């Protein structure tokens, strides 16, 4: 039986490719998709979800828009990374369907209530919607199998010296998720910076030759430009968000450790930092499965294989 998942995202080039990977995988049953502000404004990330599902002919999947700002902070967006639309690069189809007439939290709660088995929540943006769900529906915690997030890192940042973008946008929400008691799987920069897509990988995807693989290649063309900045020291573009889906499909591609993780919400230099107790110094019981390494070639091969689904 396919694993039921609920995807909360802020597309975003890598979010879009995570959607592509999830919907090409019969092992997964995507019950609903909710959008969050983050990589772009809430209006644009919602539109990008609708555009991607129109492209993939999956307008049957219910979609809802989430919180317009973080729990306690002003919204920060990453338009310098993802462009004016949030998915700059390819020409995407106009949406042919509308979102549900409800909030993201309402759609999440409905999805959990109606599922016969616990649902895995995959969250590839700021954790605002997930935190609101957890706080407003404690009775539904038992219906959540795990929460797989793209966010955080052990000791490095990509938005500040200490913080990864998704966590930095709403650290209070991320702290709620990590301390919820629900199993958390963390795909942080330690692993996603190793999941780089090189130019030759993009050309491999383009050569598959179907409309979706072509769009993915064009998304990567744009995404690579930002990551050419020599400060990163990258060969390609790190494909952060699809690591969450790839872990669900092929966990053997990833090396993980069980550790306690907390989120810094007040530090002068470290707001948004995920504090990973790697050496068990706090005495706290592990609350997260933390990805630390990936078989890059296996990750690329998985993407290439699943893109053929859209022929």
Swiss-Prot record:
The active site is at residue 240. Keywords: Glycosidase, Hydrolase. GO terms for biological process: nucleobase-containing small molecule interconversion; purine nucleoside catabolic process; pyrimidine nucleobase metabolic process. Its EC number is 3.2.-.-. InterPro entries: I/U_nuclsd_hydro_CS, Inosine/uridine_hydrolase_dom, IUNH, Pyrim_hydro_RihA, Ribo_hydro-like. One of its GO terms (molecular function) is purine nucleosidase activity. One of its GO terms (cellular component) is cytosol. Disulfide bonds: none annotated. It is an enzyme of class 3 (hydrolase). Belongs to the IUNH family. RihA subfamily. NCBIfam families: PRK10443.1 (NF007761). Hydrolyzes with equal efficiency cytidine or uridine to ribose and cytosine or uracil, respectively. This is Pyrimidine-specific ribonucleoside hydrolase RihA. The lineage of its organism: Bacteria, Pseudomonadati, Pseudomonadota, Gammaproteobacteria, Enterobacterales.
């Amino acid at each position: 039986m396919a694993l039921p998942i609920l995807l909360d995202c802020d597309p975003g080039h890598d979010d879009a490719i995570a959607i592509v990977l999830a919907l090409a995988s019969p092992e997964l049953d995507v019950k609903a998709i909710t959008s969050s502000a983050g990589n772009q404004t809430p209006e644009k990330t919602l539109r990008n979800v609708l555009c991607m599902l129109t492209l993939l002919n999956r307008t049957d999947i219910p979609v809802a828009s989430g919180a317009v700002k973080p729990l306690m902070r002003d919204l920060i967006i990453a338009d310098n990374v993802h462009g004016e639309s949030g998915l700059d690069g390819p020409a995407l189809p106009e949406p042919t369907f509308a979102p549900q007439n409800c909030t993201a939290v309402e759609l999440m709660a409905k999805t959990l209530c109606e599922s016969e088995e616990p649902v895995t929540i995959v969250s590839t943006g700021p954790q605002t919607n997930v935190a609101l769900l957890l706080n407003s529906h404690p009775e539904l915690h038992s219906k959540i199998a795990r929460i797989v997030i793209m966010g955080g890192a052990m000791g490095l940042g990509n938005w500040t010296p200490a913080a990864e973008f998704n966590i930095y946008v709403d650290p209070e929400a991320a702290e709620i998720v990590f301390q919820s008691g629900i199993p958390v799987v963390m795909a942080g920069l330690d692993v996603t910076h190793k999941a780089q897509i090189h130019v030759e990988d993009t050309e491999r995807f383009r050569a598959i030759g179907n409309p979706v693989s072509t769009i993915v290649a064009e998304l990567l063309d744009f995404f690579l430009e930002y990551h050419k900045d020599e400060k990163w020291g990258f060969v390609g573009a790190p494909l952060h968000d699809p690591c969450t889906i790839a872990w669900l499909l092929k966990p053997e591609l990833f090396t993980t450790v069980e550790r306690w993780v907390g989120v810094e919400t007040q530090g002068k230099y470290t707001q948004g930092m995920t504090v990973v107790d790697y050496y068990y110094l706090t005495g706290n019981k592990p609350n997260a499965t933390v990805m630390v390494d990936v078989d890059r070639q296996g990750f690329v091969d998985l993407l290439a294989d699943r893109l053929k689904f859209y022929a």
